[in-house]
Amino acid sequence: VTPPGDDRTRRPAHAASSGVPVRVTGLASVLLAPNPGPMTLDGTRSYVLAAPGARTRVVVDPGPDDVAHLTALADGPRVEVVLITHRHADHTAGAARFAELTGAPVRAADPAHCHPARSREATPLRGGETIHAAGLRIEVLATPGHTGDSTSFHLPDDGPHGSVLTGDTVLGRGTTVIAEPDGSLRDYLTSLDALESIGATTVLPAHGPHLGDLSAVVRTYREHRAGRLAQVRTALGDRAGDPVTEALVDDVTASVYGDVVPGLLSAARQSVRAQLRYLAEGA
């Protein structure tokens, strides 16, 4: 959940949705979907990946089922494959239509969000595999936590330090929600450790501006989580170990996130529920 008072819907100038992907690194361009909001920041960032001179492209997260956005995203060299960071609708709702527009298979960790196209198979993504497409090496990283199927994509050849498309695992502004019941704080912290080990690579998030040092961002995220857990422990007091009921979630949310804006209250409750379950597991 983003800090209170943060304007989650402002659009960075470099990400304005003009209908044409804007280059953000040597190998990645972004087309911003027209779906700004409290949970999507300035909107979902659909990424277009290709090596210089490549005749095909890779698209990551087609985004919402918006015809104008999908048509603009499909315009250009042939899309070889579509990759999905996780199952949420702001990333996947347009995937089936985009597969029809481009003839490109859609691959996701969750088989329910894989779409074959024009007899081209769409196998589920596997953590640890390397995809070779559009002149690129794309390393698939299983990074569950935000959701159980959350996946990141490492481009080791993108500039001197590479880049990582982090989906909603690491955002360009604020911090992400652990989407209960599918998400897991324990898994999320493990995923942060894995991302930090990559080093000072460029962060290409699904929401918010790109960032310069993944390892530094991850350290900030971990400090934020530790601080929130300390607040939750304090709010629990002598109720530590009690069953995680909705009444307990409400009480802790009011104590820890009392100043959160109304549009983010549901996300705050999800985060509290995830933290309570984490503590109940013996953290």
Question: What are these language model-derived features?
Answer:
Residues A54-V59, P64-D66, R137-A235:
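Metallo-beta-lactamase
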Residues T85-H91, H146, H207, Q275:
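Histidine-centered divalent metal-coordination motifs
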Residues V1-V20:
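Actinobacteria-biased recognition of intrinsically disordered, low-complexity terminal regions
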Residues H14-D75, S152-G167:
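Conserved beta-strand hairpin/beta-sheet module of binuclear metal-dependent hydrolase folds
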Residues G37-G43, P62-E139, D158-G162:
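Active-site HxH/HxHxD metal-binding segment of metal-dependent hydrolases
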Residues L236-A283:
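C-terminal regulatory/interaction regions
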